[in-house]
Curated annotation (Swiss-Prot):
It is an enzyme of class 2 (transferase). Belongs to the CbiD family. HAMAP family: CbiD. Pathway: Cofactor biosynthesis; adenosylcobalamin biosynthesis; cob(II)yrinate a,c-diamide from sirohydrochlorin (anaerobic route): step 6/10. This is Cobalt-precorrin-5B C(1)-methyltransferase. SUPFAM superfamilies: CbiD-like. Signal peptide: none annotated. It comes from Prosthecochloris aestuarii (strain DSM 271 / SK 413). GO terms for biological process: anaerobic cobalamin biosynthetic process; methylation. The gene is cbiD. Its EC number is 2.1.1.195. Pfam families: CbiD. It catalyses: Co-precorrin-5B + S-adenosyl-L-methionine = Co-precorrin-6A + S-adenosyl-L-homocysteine. Keywords: Cobalamin biosynthesis, Methyltransferase, S-adenosyl-L-methionine, Transferase. One of its GO terms (molecular function) is cobalt-precorrin-5B C1-methyltransferase activity.
Length: 369
């Protein structure tokens, strides 16, 4: 997909690639030749063209591949071949599509994804796209039968280890995904949908207690506190803690919530900032100085805190402990902000540093853990 100068180039989802590969494979099966270009209709009504490759045809079916182009998005699936093998099912009715899992495509092992457990991780929108693309071609040839579609992605199992698939119960490969058919570089919508997906899987898996944290590093600390919780109960918000809390509250299926935040990001959250990205809000020395003064520390401590260039160095001035009024006040402020987004249910806030442990605050107060 081309872009104007200075714009980020869009790409296409694995769902679009699978649709194009399936259409090219069916064309090869019915016509005997692989098309040089294949056009598909996207969910928004637009169209996209692809160049299929690696076409093969035998007595039982045909296969083609389309190489994934994610545009300027840092997508781990970029460059992978998305392949489809199609075979006619003469005993099945018109419109019947049997989706099968090939190499590198994951298997769904948990509920909550809108796909039957045990089935291939081909999401509902790509399934609909493939069904439409093949139906039109069958009509053109006057065929009234079903089609078996086997989707494979060579190298997909290895790439899947770099994704959150295992966390949402997709094992053994990547998912064939996409709601618009397009990859928008650094898409906020796609990022938030990935968080929503982990929340849905947690609920469908029976979790009533969620632990929300920025990522793997903070999760490692929190797992020590909750060793009996399943992996699906740990939700990564990245920097979007506000949106994540909103989704958890809207879901309504959770009785207890623990929110863990590292010290530097906690100074942002305590000010009411709900997007903790450094691009959105930076270090505020005045806020830290104000909090130090408010909690009764000496003038020299306040001035040292104001001069900080890195928040994590605050522990060199005030030892990290729940006995210190500074950290209790910071954690309690963060908990109040979170409570505004999660008004019902039990709520814990955990203030963390990598070196000095954790401070947990709930309705009973704060303590070291």
């Amino acid at each position: 997909m081309t872009a104007q100068k200075g714009e980020l180039r869009q790409g296409y989802t694995t769902g679009s690639c699978a649709t194009a590969a399936a259409r090219a494979a069916l064309h090869l099966l019915l016509d005997g030749q692989m098309p040089e270009r294949v056009s598909i209709t996207l969910p928004d009504g637009g169209s996209a063209e692809f160049s299929p490759e690696a076409g093969r045809r035998d007595a039982a079916g045909a296969s083609c591949c389309v190489r994934k182009d994610a545009g300027d998005d840092p997508d781990v699936t970029n460059g992978l071949l998305v392949c489809c093998r199609v075979a006619l099912l003469d005993d099945e009715p018109e419109g019947h599509i049997e989706f099968c899992r090939g190499e590198g495509v994951g298997m769904v092992t948990l509920p909550g994804l809108g796909i039957d457990v045990g089935g291939p991780a081909i999401n509902p929108v790509p399934r609909s796209m493939i069904r439409e693309a093949l139906g039109g071609l069958l009509d053109r040839y006057g065929l009234r039968c079903g089609v078996q579609v086997t989707v494979s992605v060579p190298g997909g199992e290895e790439v899947a280890r770099k994704t959150l698939n295992a966390r949402v119960g997709v094992k053994g490969g990547i998912s064939i995904i996409g709601t618009s058919g397009r990859v928008i570089p650094y898409s906020e919508e796609a990022y938030l949908e990935s968080i929503a997906r982990t929340i849905r899987v947690a609920r469908h898996s029976g979790s009533t207690h969620l632990v929300a944290c920025a990522g793997a590093r903070s999760e490692k600390l929190l797992r020590r506190m909750y060793p009996d919780l399943p992996e699906t109960a740990f939700i990564h918000y990245g920097n979007r803690v506000g949106s994540t809390l909103d989704m958890i509250q809207h879901d309504g299926g959770f009785r207890n919530l623990t929110v863990g935040v590292m010290l530097a990001k906690a100074t942002k959250l305590a000010q009411g900032e709900l997007d903790l990205s450094s691009r959105t809000v930076g270090l505020n020395p005045q806020f830290i100085e104000h909090l130090v003064r408010k909690t009764g520390y000496a003038e020299d401590v306040a001035l040292e805190a104001k001069a900080l260039e890195l928040v994590r160095s605050l522990v060199d001035i005030v030892p990290f402990s729940s006995s210190e009024p500074l950290y209790r006040a910071l954690a309690e402020s963060c908990r109040r902000v979170c409570r505004n987004r999660f008004p019902s249910g039990g709520l814990e806030f955990v203030l963390m540093t990598m070196q000095d442990g954790c401070i947990l605050c709930d309705e009973h107060g704060c303590r070291d853990v």
